[in-house]
């Protein structure tokens, strides 16, 4: 693992390539941005019942993961936790 590469910024070419991949994945899975936003809102509402989260830094996107049969769609969520709520 190259530690210097880990801390370096992505080039605009790499960012554009990653965005295009995400658009293609969303298109192939027939999930519109509106539906993805609805999923995001619903997930955050449920999670917020139990955990205090940082809504500003939430990142939810469609991706793909390699399965035995090939590539499968995946919903990837990065949700920063501030603290666990007590009942």
UniProtKB/Swiss-Prot annotation:
Q: Which domain of life is it from?
A: Bacteria
For this protein, the record's InterPro entries field holds:
MinE, MinE_sf
Q: Keywords on this record?
A: Cell cycle, Cell division
| BP GO annotations | division septum site selection; regulation of division septum assembly
Q: Does the keyword Metal-binding apply?
A: no
Question: What do the Gene Ontology cellular component annotations say?
Answer: plasma membrane
The record's family statement is: Belongs to the MinE family.
Q: What does this protein do?
A: Prevents the cell division inhibition by proteins MinC and MinD at internal division sites while permitting inhibition at polar sites. This ensures cell division at the proper site by restricting the formation of a division septum at the midpoint of the long axis of the cell.
Q: Spell out the protein name for this chain.
A: Cell division topological specificity factor
Naturally occurring in which organism (per UniProt): Clostridium botulinum (strain Hall / ATCC 3502 / NCTC 13319 / Type A)
| Taxonomic classification | Bacteria, Bacillati, Bacillota, Clostridia, Eubacteriales
The gene for this chain is minE
């Amino acid at each position: 693992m190259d530690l210097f590469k880990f801390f370096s910024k992505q080039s605009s070419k790499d960012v554009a390539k990653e965005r295009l991949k995400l658009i293609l994945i969303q298109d192939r899975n027939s999930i519109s941005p509106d539906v993805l936003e609805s999923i995001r809102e619903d997930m955050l509402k449920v999670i917020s019942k139990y955990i205090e989260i940082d809504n500003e830094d939430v990142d939810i996107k469609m991706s793909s993961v390699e399965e035995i049969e090939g590539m499968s769609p995946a919903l990837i969520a990065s949700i920063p936790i501030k603290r666990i709520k007590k009942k």
